[in-house]
């Protein structure tokens, strides 16, 4: 550890926290800031004004690792030059590669894993308080927030190192989640996005069965305007959730369910626990139970051994099923995974990228047609930003950060971020709706 250890720092130091990666990481960062601020510590949004820098890293795929390492290196240079007094690194990358990072980056004062909030607070000169563990300072716009239902994952997907980074699946209690949600509601949050590494088995470890549906009903009763479900695993998904979604007006007709692939051989190699027939049957059941639902999914292409015929099978599935939202990643050969240990990364990177492009071009055409069907219709939207005479908003069918944007002429109406309004859609493209605001919803 460098000289002038920051463990004895006084409370007049300013802290900058850089949160990288997914929304689960964001929640971890919000909890750290919330607890620290509650104890009187000061944070800044400007890295150049900080005495202490904390980087919450992502280690999921190669691109995320590279971004995390680049940010650490930049901050380490500041630490080396005396521009900051301390540098701490936390999160998934730190959990997975702590020993290697310590050896390569002596400028970093301390590395922490994903469950080290008490230790981080301690080194900042304050104490962890279990009674306020859900105290959060939101990093998202104040009108929406993430509610993390669990920590870790007990699935054994061959391409994923999340269980190594975050441990086995551990649900938060319903009581704690309802308490946290109540606090978020009091902060003015209107849209609650339910997240986890996997929301499907929520409660199984605590109650012996999935309690996702029960939790949704309880959260719905708290009167959020929108409640949204993200990161649902296909295997053992509780279909009663879709019935509740259809019945409850404030639960968005939206489900994010990454299926990753459709070829039986690849699904088996991925250790997904579900085959093509089971996947299609589940998705058809979901649409049958709620015809108005919008389904988002994620695919991986270029998985080891993926033949052209297997990729064509995936294309045909997407062509026929017509997902409402779809993202695609090229396979990333990650250490600490079964695929890395047992399979050869034999698809050239150029070929992977070509397959990503081909699949996304197909989806673009599907999305264009689906959005065109919304033209001349009036939709309820949530305003995200206002700039001059334009408002940028989302429908209930679009999650924050990843889905479509709705660009609206405010028509002189006084509108602010966080407002709901009715909008008439006049034009569309694959990933954007364009229209005008009819009226603000009180």
Swiss-Prot record:
Belongs to the methylthiotransferase family. RimO subfamily. Gene3D superfamilies: Methylthiotransferase, N-terminal domain, Nucleic acid-binding proteins, tm_1862 like domain. Catalyzes the methylthiolation of an aspartic acid residue of ribosomal protein uS12. It is an enzyme of class 2 (transferase). The gene is rimO. Its main location: cytoplasm. This is Ribosomal protein uS12 methylthiotransferase RimO. Its cofactor is [4Fe-4S] cluster.
